[in-house]
A protein has these predicted regions:
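Interfacial segments of multi-pass membrane proteins
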Residues: 49, 72-75, 89, 93, ...
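C-terminal ends of transmembrane helices
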Residues: 19-24, 91-102, 134-145
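Helix-coil boundary and interhelical linker segments in multi-pass alpha-helical membrane proteins
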Residues: 1-9, 67-85, 116-126
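N-terminal signal-anchor transmembrane alpha helix
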Residues: 2-27
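Transmembrane helix boundary and interhelical junction motifs in multipass membrane proteins
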Residues: 15-21, 103-111, 126
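Cytosolic, membrane-interface loops and tails of multi-pass inner-membrane proteins
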Residues: 21-52, 104
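Multi-pass membrane catalytic core of lipid/isoprenoid biosynthesis enzymes
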Residues: 41, 47-73
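Short, non-helical or kinked segments that cap or interrupt transmembrane helices
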Residues: 31-39, 99-112, 143-154
Length: 159
């Protein structure tokens, strides 16, 4: 029963697209209108609404992935197969939100949040950020999905 509650919490939090709503409510900016990908994500919040909206969106997107996983990790058995669903729920909620008629984002920031909730120690977080920045700015990998797969793969091998 507790697993179900954490899965539901994660999916509902994931379905709340902070990177879409923060720019829209505070800056009257629809971040999905101008960019060609029409993605309601943090990168578009930064580009369309500015630094403050982007940073606030990033923090909220990270927390919505981290909070349910962190809390569940303290209460539930991490070794259970159901714990994988707890971790996946915020990501699926973001990718297929019922609040937005299933028009979600790529779930990159919320995936980072899930990892932060699972590994709250500082080293893994810096490692993940380093890989993502490396493949975003230095050795640019496109598309975003390929960059994310490589980042998460290297993260898994090195942490």
């Amino acid at each position: 029963m507790m697993y179900f509650l954490f899965i539901l919490l994660g999916f509902v939090l994931g379905s709340t697209l902070f990177a879409y709503w923060i720019p829209r409510l505070f800056f009257k900016t629809d971040i999905t209108k101008v960019p060609p990908d029409h993605n309601p994500g943090v990168a578009n919040a930064y580009m369309q609404a500015g630094f403050f909206a982007g940073t606030l969106s990033l923090l909220c997107e990270l927390f919505k992935g981290a909070v349910p996983v962190f809390l569940a990790d303290r209460i539930l058995d991490r070794d259970s197969m159901l714990f994988a669903l707890v971790m996946a729920a915020p990501v699926f909620g973001h990718a297929f939100p019922f609040f937005q008629k299933e028009r979600g984002g790529k779930a990159i920031a919320v995936s980072f949040g899930v990892m932060i909730g699972l590994f709250p120690e500082i080293h893994p977080l810096f490692c993940l950020i380093f890989y993502y920045i490396l493949f975003s700015l230095v050795l640019t990998l496109r598309p975003h999905s390929f960059r994310s797969v490589i980042t998460y793969g290297l993260f898994t091998l090195t942490v």
